[in-house]
Amino acid sequence: MVISDYFEIERAYAKLNLYLDVLSKRPDGYHNITGLFQTIDLHDELEISQIDKRGEVRIETNIEIQGTNLIEKAFRTVEKFYNVGFGIKVRLKKNIPMGSGLGGGSSDAAAVLRFLGRKLKISIKDLLILAAEVGSDVPFLIVGGTAIVEGRGEKVTFLNPISDYRVDLFCPTISVSTKFAYQMIHESTYAKKPDFALKLYEAYLKRDHNQIKALSYNVFQEIMTSKYPQIQDALDKAQRCNPIVAMMTGSGSCIFAVQADKGKYRFIEDVFQHL
């Protein structure tokens, strides 16, 4: 097999759910959500190159990939709609913890879609449609930055970026299944306040720390902290840092603490500003 010496580097950025609620369960088995999503500068790094063998996906990584391989799923999804006359080799350096709610696997898939989009001249609009076929977080992570996300994740409204905030992460060494998390919640736990995501965004822009704390919400947090003492311990540790707000991202297990002027990671603009 001939492998090109030429590769492109893609960064797959982690995401935070600054707000996350479930509005209803859909007939197709998915859930309608509403959320305020934000990328931070923690990222996986992918070296992606074309290989001659059509349809082959080769992945080399520093850790074992668990569950569905979203990198391969991204490639197969593009194959269904486009004439992809090559395979790909991906060297993946994982920095985003798996099963943490930080969207690492989805962001890796989005990085592969961006690569294929350039090679096959696929528009961003069409990439977003393909991304929705791959996974619920993938459309947002094609672009990243700051966005209101609705539907099952396919409806993304990109917003002017929230800037000048930093965040620390407190990630217990447990992995939470998204499928399991959705099985644990029920309609009585839904906040059903779809306007709160936009109100929270406005509070971040105004740097209104009291409103940020009051409006921040994750529908999974109460259930997951009661189910997993390690997540509650991480939340307690984060709150001792006196942040603007500390909360869980996604369905867990990672806790983030938002700070005004300190913290290891920072909020970033869309991914195209950081390639």
From Swiss-Prot:
The active site is at K15, D137. Keywords: ATP-binding, Isoprene biosynthesis, Kinase, Nucleotide-binding, Transferase. It comes from the Bacteria. Its EC number is 2.7.1.148. InterPro entries: GHMP_kinase_C_dom, GHMP_kinase_C_sf, GHMP_kinase_N_dom, IspE, Ribosomal_Su5_D2-typ_SF, Ribsml_uS5_D2-typ_fold_subgr. It catalyses: 4-CDP-2-C-methyl-D-erythritol + ATP = 4-CDP-2-C-methyl-D-erythritol 2-phosphate + ADP + H(+). Disulfide bonds: none annotated. It is an enzyme of class 2 (transferase). GO terms for molecular function: 4-(cytidine 5'-diphospho)-2-C-methyl-D-erythritol kinase activity; ATP binding. Pathway: Isoprenoid biosynthesis; isopentenyl diphosphate biosynthesis via DXP pathway; isopentenyl diphosphate from 1-deoxy-D-xylulose 5-phosphate: step 3/6. Transmembrane segments: none annotated. ATP binds at P97, M98, G99, S100, G101, L102, G103, G104, G105, S106, S107. GO terms for biological process: isopentenyl diphosphate biosynthetic process, methylerythritol 4-phosphate pathway; terpenoid biosynthetic process. Belongs to the GHMP kinase family. IspE subfamily. Catalyzes the phosphorylation of the position 2 hydroxy group of 4-diphosphocytidyl-2C-methyl-D-erythritol. This is 4-diphosphocytidyl-2-C-methyl-D-erythritol kinase. The gene is ispE.
